[in-house]
């Protein structure tokens, strides 16, 4: 069955649709149309007028969604999602990127793109999506000593598998492919030019995606993916490619943040006060870890930054939280200024 190759499972087939309708999966999103594949054909579909009028933008179809298709090839409804990846735009509105993927592959290159702060941000949204995160480090052939990067990953990516790959020699792909479940859906996340298109070609074993070279002046790749699209590989995996995202806003669900920064969250449980701001309160376990070097300042400050960003989006979407959050962060900021002024220099 075609849809089984495209990842449909009993979770979706058990969701009831009309007898005259059929199941489909969205393989690409364009401005006014969606490319959908069913058991019989692949086509461009539009939304059924009126069915989505009063729904929020997050209820609209996105790449990876399983949908109900009418006899005249219109999308009637979106089936319940298992996983979903979204980001917050500049207006604090949630923007859907993709849905129903099993693995979130965070692709970074071992050149100027390698950035732990960005990695922590990607890990936060990956955990929050409900999928299993995997770190892919491309251009491993350019690095003589990988231990430097391995040590940095250990500091922020707790228990997340990392694979060092070379798209030219195919080094590292055998280990990755043996760990991926067959017929699973993968989403690729990463900045422009990190080698996502080349990675897909290596995974597919053919030149499926257009690629571009690296600019010699800054080691940055050229952007090649312009829209979200799904690809069925001959080896059975389904890959969702996304345009490069160097910066994006995280939402206001704490689950992903708590998993990414599980070490800080565990430390916070040892604080004397349950409402500790982790800046200068007595018997603060987080500050104690900073003092003895157990917790790095970079990791701690990134945690605070993402906490504040989530609080910002939360109060933008829930005005009742605005005053409470402003008052809370005024106290935190004042405490931080006092703490860092009085903290002895090492």
Curated annotation (Swiss-Prot):
EC number: 3.6.1.-
Keyword Iron set for record: no
Location relative to the cell: Cytoplasm
Main location: cytoplasm
Residues that hold GTP according to the record: 138-141, 190-198
Cofactor info, note text: Binds 1 zinc ion per subunit.
Domain CP-type G, residue spans: 93-248
Alphabetically ordered keywords of this record: Cytoplasm, GTP-binding, Hydrolase, Metal-binding, Nucleotide-binding, Ribosome biogenesis, RNA-binding, rRNA-binding, Zinc
Signal peptide residues on this chain, from the entry's feature table: none
Binding locations of Zn(2+): 271, 276, 278, 284
Biological process per Gene Ontology, one example term: ribosomal small subunit biogenesis
Known cofactor(s): Zn(2+)
Quaternary structure and partners: Monomer. Associates with 30S ribosomal subunit, binds 16S rRNA.
Biological role stated in the UniProt entry: One of several proteins that assist in the late maturation steps of the functional core of the 30S ribosomal subunit. Helps release RbfA from mature subunits. May play a role in the assembly of ribosomal proteins into the subunit. Circularly permuted GTPase that catalyzes slow GTP hydrolysis, GTPase activity is stimulated by the 30S ribosomal subunit.
HAMAP family: GTPase_RsgA (MF_01820)
UniProt name for this protein: Small ribosomal subunit biogenesis GTPase RsgA 1
Organism encoding this protein: Listeria monocytogenes serovar 1/2a (strain ATCC BAA-679 / EGD-e)
UniProt lineage: Bacteria, Bacillati, Bacillota, Bacilli, Bacillales
């Amino acid at each position: 069955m075609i849809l089984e190759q495209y990842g449909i499972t009993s979770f979706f087939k058990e969701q009831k649709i009309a007898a005259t309708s059929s199941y489909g999966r969205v393989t690409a999103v364009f401005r006014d149309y969606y490319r959908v594949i069913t058991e019989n054909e692949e086509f461009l579909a539009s939304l059924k007028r009126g069915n989505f009028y009063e729904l929020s933008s997050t209820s609209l179809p996105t790449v990876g969604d399983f949908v109900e298709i009418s006899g005249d090839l219109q999308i009637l409804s979106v089936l319940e999602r298992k996983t979903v990846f979204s980001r917050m735009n500049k207006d604090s509105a949630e923007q859907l990127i993709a849905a129903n993927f099993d693995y979130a592959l965070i692709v970074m290159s071992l050149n100027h793109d390698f950035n732990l702060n960005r990695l922590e941000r990607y890990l936060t949204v990956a955990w929050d999506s409900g999928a299993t995160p995997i770190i892919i480090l491309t251009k491993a052939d350019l690095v003589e000593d990988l231990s430097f990067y391995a040590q940095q990953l250990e500091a922020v990516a707790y228990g997340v598998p990392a694979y060092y790959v070379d798209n030219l020699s195919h080094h590292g792909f055998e280990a990755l492919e043996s760990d991926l479940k067959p017929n699973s859906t993968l989403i690729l996340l990463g900045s422009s030019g990190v080698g996502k298109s080349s990675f897909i070609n290596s995974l597919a074993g053919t030149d499926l995606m257009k690629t571009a070279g690296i600019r010699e002046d800054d080691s940055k790749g050229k952007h090649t993916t312009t829209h979200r699209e799904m690809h069925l590989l001959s080896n059975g995996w389904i890959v969702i490619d996304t345009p490069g995202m160097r910066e994006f806003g995280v939402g206001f669900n704490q689950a992903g943040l708590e998993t990414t920064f599980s070490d800080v969250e565990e430390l916070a449980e040892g604080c004397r006060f349950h409402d500790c701001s982790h800046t200068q309160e007595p018997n603060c376990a987080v500050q104690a870890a900073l003092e003895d070097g157990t917790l790095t300042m970079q990791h701690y400050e990134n945690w605070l930054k993402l906490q504040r960003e989530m609080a910002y989006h939360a109060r933008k979407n829930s005005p009742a939280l605005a005053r409470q959050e402003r008052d809370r962060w005024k106290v935190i900021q004042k405490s931080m200024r006092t703490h860092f002024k009085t903290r002895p220099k090492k």
